[in-house]
Amino acid sequence: FILNTHHHFDHVGGNAELKKKYSSKILGFEKDKNRIPSIDVLLKDDQEFRIGNLNFRTIFIPGHTLGHIAFYLEKEKIVFTGDTLFSLGCGRIFEGTYQQMFDSLNKIKSLPGDTEIYCGHEYTNNNLEFCLKFNPNNNYLKEKEKIIKAKIKEKKPTIPTTIKEEIQTNIFLRYDDLDVKSTLNLKNA
């Protein structure tokens, strides 16, 4: 099985070749049926499905694209967020609106804190620098910086992260934090 979070080529470009080589089924959101190559299974929002002994649930999270979904495994406490939420960042808005992205980030933010996040790209170090610029007094972020730098030095991945860590450190989930608002001159927003 190949699960597609959205239609961008860097995520679906190998679908046909992988499908042919491994006789895989391609799964994706129904709204992207004409944009995900070789799609076999059209998924709906909040749809549950099973692969082997794993139970998945889709979460519709538009913003980065209009047909973006996440794959959530509640029992395993794992979510695949594609390009909507990254470690210490979020994806660019290509097709959706800022309100859609805001709502989608809040959907992800509402998952249990110990849920592991597997995102579509490894931008952690760049995102760290960005977050430190706008949230320099965040002690959780300073601690996470040490962990990230150590992992990079040891050539280890910085993914996964968790919902709890992202709520504490990711400025895109800390929009209501007074320190972040102050740095952005948005105290009254």
Question: Model-predicted segments: where are they?
Answer:
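Glycine-rich, phosphate-binding/catalytic loops in enzymes
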Residues: 19-21, 97-98, 135-136
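Accessory terminal helices/loops
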Residues: 106-116, 125-189
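Active-site HxH/HxHxD metal-binding segment of metal-dependent hydrolases
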Residues: 1-58, 147
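Surface-exposed loop/turn and secondary-structure junction residues enriched for glycine/proline
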Residues: 12-15, 39, 45-46, 52, ...
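Catalytic core of the metallo-beta-lactamase
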Residues: 36-132
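Residue-level signal for threonine
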Residues: 29, 65, 162
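Proline- and acidic/polar-enriched loop/turn elements at helix boundaries
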Residues: 4, 31, 120, 124, ...
